[in-house]
Amino acid sequence: MLAFRRAVEARELERVGELLTEDVVLHSPIAYRPYRGREMVAGIINLVTTILEDFTYQCEIGAESDNDHALVFGARIGDLSIEGCDFVHTDAEGLIDELTVMLRPLRAVHAFEERMRAKFAAAVAATSTKIEAST
């Protein structure tokens, strides 16, 4: 089983960050441009775990020795069911250097986007406040 899957299922978010390369790229289902860098991507994954309820991986496609994996998952957002797939690429050391996330159905994606944008804006504002306070 992919170490990323084990860490996400166990909600070991610090471990998730350790499994990312420094220059990891995240292709989000709600943003046109990809997010880059371990700190940014780990932070986004952390936010996602606060939005998706009853998150479970249902299927993993790809052999342990492969560099490409697909992790099919299900979750809830309030009373809406959401399904998705994490397409994970690992480098030669087994660290994740690219992650692409797909979600469906559209109504649940809109609910996810609404909640994610609010949490992301709050996180950016909190980070900006910390930076200003330290200068």
Please describe what each predicted stretch is.
Residues 1-135:
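C-terminal and inter-domain tail/linker signature
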